[in-house]
């Protein structure tokens, strides 16, 4: 300031003076700016911008991954986990969409949930693994899907279901295990969805074990007169069975005898 001056000096950009007859200018505060020389006022940084220093002629745009949610700000704020911001100069962050997640702060993008995982909510920092009995077979899924009857899944995070093995069935949705066909029944094919799919052993045959895929013919000297037998019956004394897979025993003819059980002929 010079005494006896014949002119007035302008405040430079970044400074201002609201009063008359002053000998100096004020530097713009942090969070504010003065864009033009000879200004009487400072201006607050707008939403999406900030200024950490004094005496500035402009504000800084928030960087991607950050935001400024109030005017007159001196700093930008990192987007929290579960949110992201791909653009600069923004006043807020975007929630991760359903089927997506954001695991870190200051992220500029969201990430798709991988196969075997899903996320039904928005704004999340991780995806959920598919539960046992369920599967997720695509990326970015917002739900898990139940295994249909005839299939099952015992593990978490699966991308498909397992088909019921031969000798087994699955009769409910979202099953975590298959059920073995009971003794006396069998199933030669995969994917059974009902206990009724297990077939009873035919007469002349038997099934001794659960989870069987085939029936077994009764051996010589034995027979099965009923369906669904788990063992064959031995021919009684006085009777014989001389062929496999027999449905009945035969009496010894007149003049012949048989004292023992399970025989194939008479004496």
Indicate residue ranges for each PLM-predicted region:
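Disulfide-rich, cysteine-dense extracellular ectodomains and adjacent flexible linkers of secreted
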Residues: 1-267
């Amino acid at each position: 300031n010079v005494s006896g001056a014949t002119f007035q000096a302008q405040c430079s950009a970044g400074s201002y003076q609201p009063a008359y007859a002053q000998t100096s200018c004020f530097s713009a505060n942090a969070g504010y700016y003065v864009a033009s020389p000879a200004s009487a006022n400072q201006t607050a940084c707008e939403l999406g911008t900030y200024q950490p220093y004094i005496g500035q002629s402009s504000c800084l745009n928030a960087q991607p991954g950050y935001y400024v949610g109030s005017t007159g700000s001196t700093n930008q704020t990192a987007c929290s986990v579960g949110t992201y911001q791909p653009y600069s100069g923004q006043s807020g962050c975007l929630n991760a969409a359903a089927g997506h997640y954001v695991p870190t702060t200051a992220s500029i993008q969201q990430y798709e949930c991988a196969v075997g995982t899903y996320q039904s909510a928005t704004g999340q920092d991780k995806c959920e693994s598919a539960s046992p009995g369920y599967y997720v077979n695509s990326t970015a899924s917002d739900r898990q899907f139940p295994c249909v009857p005839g299939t099952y899944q015992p593990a978490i995070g699966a991308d498909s279901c397992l088909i019921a093995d031969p000798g087994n069935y699955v009769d409910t949705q979202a099953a975590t295990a298959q059920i073995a066909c009971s003794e006396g029944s069998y199933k030669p094919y995969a994917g059974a969805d009902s206990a009724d799919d297990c077939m009873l052993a035919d007469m002349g045959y038997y099934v001794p074990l659960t989870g069987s895929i085939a029936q077994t013919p009764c051996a010589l000297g034995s027979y099965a007169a009923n369906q669904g037998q788990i063992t064959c019956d031995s021919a009684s004394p006085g009777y014989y069975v001389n062929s496999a897979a027999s449905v009945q025993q035969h009496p010894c003819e007149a003049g012949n005898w048989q004292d023992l059980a399970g025989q194939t002929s008479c004496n």
